[in-house]
Amino acid sequence: MSDDKGKAPKRTEDESSGKDGKKIPPQLATLLLDQNPALKQELANMDKDQAAALLHNMDLSQMLTGLSMGGKNQKDMASYKFWQTQPVPAFNDAANKQIEQGPIKIIDPEKVSQTPGALIDGFEWCTLDLTNAEELKELYELLNNHYVEDDNAMFRFSYSESFLHWALMSPGWKKEWHVGVRATKSRKLVASICGVPTELRVRGERIKVTEINFLCIHKKLRSKRLTPVLIKEITRRCYVNGIYQAIYTGGVILPTPVSSCRYYHRALDWLKLYEVGFSPLPHGSTKARMITKNHLPTETLTPGLRPMEVKDIDAVYDLLERYMRRFDMNQAFTREEIDHWLVYKEQPDKEQVVWSYVVEDPETHKITDFVSFYNLSSTVIDHPKHEAVRAAYLYYYASETAFSDDQKAFKERLQLLMNDALICAKKAHFDVFNALTSHDNPLFLEQLKFGAGDGQLHFYLYNYRAAPIAGGINQKNLPDESKMGGVGIVML
């Protein structure tokens, strides 16, 4: 296939037929392969007859492996062949109306390898010690130089050392789940994959899972096929500790999302977002008009709103637990996790990562509402004026009004609470406030002038099968109040 490397293999038949007699027109096959570099590369590495046979036996859903609605692709992560070997739901499972919820594969602890798999020559496994400032800095530098960028290489997530400490050292964290790969000679950290333990509720079933994050590979090693090896190694380490399920997210379509949400963005400093290329100037509008449109009051409006303190942990824990149970897939918090994830404890050498606020009823002193957001900035690549976009991400929230039968009152309360969160974020010098269509967010996104993003976030369960869960969007990919009640977890 040397002459056709990277192109869809030619066929003598009029169409490439998929399984079960489904036909994939050659034009569609070519289009899908053009948007799917992982599968394209796999076909390019085969001889012509092998590639034609594989394509002939694939159905349309299988060809979607590795596609992203936003055009973003992680070639290695999206490997069709790799995901065929993993205990994840197949695309066509979604067509089965009677999906039996539960583990896909029962793991025999006796058969779990106690040693890591082989790595390519010149590289070796390591376990990161994030209590060691030098190793934490190494992970910070790897992520800041080689982690997620947007399509146009204008922005890259910028994880601070404080953020990594917060995200990876939650209650019950395990050092061995902070996995790295080093170059044997230089000792340089060139890849990572990390996990933290948590507990999910999926339609009432409690599952101990590992939350997988920070899969990152040095740009110069992207062709080395390290991603499947990293995933297998973190899986092995979780199995050794008796955890057989995981949750992870991504912008790429893999087999098979349990849910998908859409990103929405609310400008806090519209002019800066325009200058860095994040926000466009709508046709027929002006800069002055857009600044006015996105203006916020200087003071919050909810009586009794104040920063959350340690003394509020029990009340927030009770409120949040009741609120979260309303969703098909949610995080089952412990009191210790509420303390870790939501309470900011000021330290002179660490920047603030999370902002949490409670509403204390002025008369009863009961906590009636709670809202939080966290800081995840993005580096602006090669910009003459701005170095970073300071982004607030909506985190967890809850309100007692959710438990009444008055949906209108709940909607109004949520809009008031979220508008105050925007004001608090603006006061804390954030440039943009991001939120998904998860939780009850469709009740306020459009009303509070959030704009639709071009990114989707797909949620995946590893070694666990569940019927599809609503992500707050309809078939037109717009927020829909009738599609709420599904996703109730926030992944960092």
What are these regions (language model features)?
Residues 2-33, 37-46, 52-58, 65-91, ...:
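Active-site/acyl-donor-binding loops of N-acyltransferases
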Residues 83, 88, 112-114, 119-219, ...:
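A conserved beta-strand-loop-helix scaffold within acyl/acetyltransferase catalytic domains
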Residues 85, 104, 145, 212, ...:
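Hydrophobic transmembrane signal anchors and adjacent membrane-proximal interface regions, especially
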Residues 94-97, 191, 242:
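Conserved ATPase active-site switch/coordination loops adjacent to the nucleotide-binding site
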Residues 130, 134, 225, 329, ...:
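Residue-level detector of secondary-structure boundary/capping sites
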Residues 137, 141-144, 228, 232, ...:
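A broad, structural surface signal
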Residues 214-236, 404-423:
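Conserved acetyl-CoA-binding loop-helix of GNAT-fold acetyltransferases
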Residues 217-260, 268-269, 285, 299-311, ...:
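A structural/positional concept
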